[in-house]
């Protein structure tokens, strides 16, 4: 049975499977449910700019659809609903999305299970058919139930008509059964701790995404201007290198003088990989490298290709400096200030759990079509004080900065039970990468570990690559 909580009384009696319900009855009945499915319908993906339209709460027997925008005393109702849900296990599919909207209205569930995360834990980064971890996919997989998504989005122009209400209710009807089916698989493979951890963590991630980061805009503008000036200077050095080389100037300099008596222009766009490939091939460089996606060989001006050959021509180091600065300007430049949210005044990104690598990631694309943007990666901020000093806490607050020391390597030692690694950590041996280098390279063997980092940088780097290749 579907029970609608709304002041839109015109719906009353129009269909036998949907009945009106008072707020008091809904709150009382939900308080008796130890496990509930929870879902939302919204006008978009942004909890600050978009509106919450409905909240669905229920189980296989009864589903409550709350017409969020058309209930009286909404704030008071949300406070009471939040108190009730504190004692319930709330099951979501893609919990992070719904939690971000619910947090905005004072609903903060304590005990959460996400069937989306539950499914990702089961296939643990292995190749997986696209769409199989959607609600529609897991309902079909475990329950042989088809959830019709054809009416998705109709709520925006039809409102809460019966087919939209049924669609919204369906999203919570089967969540408990899906969770139970997943839990059997988790138990079989000893995944209970992972499931518990990830479902606790998703509550935190939703909160962190809503909090965002505060940016000192005046200081950021100064940084951007300084970075752009450095980039312009590097481009001028590249152009001058062409002008000063008789062979290169003959081929790559426009012989026609500027109408206003300026310098002759250079016929290379240093920001164009295609043009730069042609240029460096003309210098006799080998630009071939394997494409990560196709596995086929291709020409590239990637730093990995050019660095080993930089001794072949003085313009190569200049170009590498230019490309590095260009990345700084494009990745850590005005795109940041452009993404400061008009409502919160902060930068927001998206975090994703349970990647193939086992790590957390952030960033990715947001929006559609021309409005699509590349979100900022909060997990890849350079160790540059000019940049980091622009990220500031609120007035009267401080940042707390913490990090695990060699987290992956500790796990490797624990899982492998390698005696030398275990002994190293039990004795608080210091830098693991230097320790491994001392085992691999004879020249490092009798050198104190704290000196290997400075005296044998390459050997330590090789050892580090070895450690992370395994861990």
Annotate each predicted stretch with a short phrase:
Residues 104, 123-127, 144, 184, ...:
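Short, well-ordered loop/turn and helix-capping segments at boundaries between secondary-structure elements
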Residues 28-32, 82-87, 393-394:
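Flexible, charged surface loops at secondary-structure boundaries
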Residues 56-61, 65-69, 351-447:
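Function-dense linear segments that define catalytic or interfacial modules
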Residues 21-50:
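Entry/capping segment at the start of metal-dependent catalytic domains
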Residues 2-17, 46-187, 195-199, 205, ...:
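Active-site-proximal helix-loop-helix substrate-binding element of RNase H-like nuclease domains
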Residues 100-101, 278-279, 411:
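Phosphate- and divalent-cation-binding pockets in alpha/beta enzyme and binding domains
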Residues 1-19, 41, 49, 172-386, ...:
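Conserved "right-hand" nucleotidyltransferase catalytic core of DNA-directed polymerases
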């Amino acid at each position: 049975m579907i029970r609608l909580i709304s002041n839109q009384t015109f719906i009353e009696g129009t269909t036998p499977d949907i009945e009106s319900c008072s707020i008091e009855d809904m709150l009382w009945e939900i308080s008796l449910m130890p496990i509930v499915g929870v879902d939302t319908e919204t006008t978009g993906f942004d909890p600050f700019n978009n509106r919450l339209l409905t909240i669905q709460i229920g189980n296989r027997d009864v589903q409550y659809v709350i017409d969020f925008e058309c209930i009286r005393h909404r704030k008071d109702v949300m406070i009471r609903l939040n108190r009730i849900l504190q004692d319930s296990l709330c099951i979501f599919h893609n919990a992070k999305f719904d939690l971000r909207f619910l947090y905005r209205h004072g609903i903060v569930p304590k005990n959460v299970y996400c069937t989306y995360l539950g499914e990702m834990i089961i296939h643990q980064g292995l190749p997986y058919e696209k769409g199989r971890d959607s609600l529609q996919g897991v309902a079909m997989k475990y329950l042989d139930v088809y959830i019709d998504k054809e009416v998705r989005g109709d709520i925006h122009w039809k409102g809460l008509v019966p087919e939209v209400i049924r669609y919204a209710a369906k999203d919570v009807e089967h969540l408990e059964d899906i969770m139970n089916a997943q839990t059997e698989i988790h138990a079989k493979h000893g995944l209970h701790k992972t499931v518990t951890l990830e479902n606790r963590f998703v509550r935190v991630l939703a909160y962190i995404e809503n909090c965002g980061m505060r940016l000192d805009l005046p200081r950021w503008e100064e940084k951007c201007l300084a970075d752009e000036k450095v980039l312009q200077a590097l481009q001028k050095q590249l152009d001058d290198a062409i002008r000063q080389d008789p062979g290169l100037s003959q081929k790559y300099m426009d012989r026609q003088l500027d109408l206003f008596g300026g310098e002759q222009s250079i016929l290379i766009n240093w920001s164009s990989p295609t043009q730069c490939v042609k240029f460096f091939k003309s210098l006799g460089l080998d630009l071939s490298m394997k494409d990560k996606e196709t596995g086929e060989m291709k020409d590239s001006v990637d730093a990995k290709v050019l660095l080993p050959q930089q001794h072949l021509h003085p313009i190569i180091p200049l170009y590498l400096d230019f490309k590095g600065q260009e990345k700084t300007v494009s990745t850590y430049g005005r795109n940041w200030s452009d993404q400061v949210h008009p409502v919160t005044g902060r930068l927001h990104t998206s975090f994703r759990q349970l990647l193939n690598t086992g790590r957390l990631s952030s960033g990715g694309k947001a929006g559609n079509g021309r409005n699509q943007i590349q979100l900022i990666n909060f997990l890849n901020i350079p160790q540059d004080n000019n940049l980091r000093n622009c990220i500031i806490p609120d007035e009267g607050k401080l940042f707390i900065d913490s990090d695990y020391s060699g987290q992956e390597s500790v796990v490797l030692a624990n899982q492998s039970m390698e005696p030398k690694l275990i002994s190293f950590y039990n004795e608080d041996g210091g830098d693991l990468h230097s320790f491994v280098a001392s085992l691999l390279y004879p020249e490092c063997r009798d050198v104190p570990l704290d000196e290997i980092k400075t005296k044998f940088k390459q050997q330590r780097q090789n050892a580090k690559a070895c450690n992370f290749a395994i861990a």
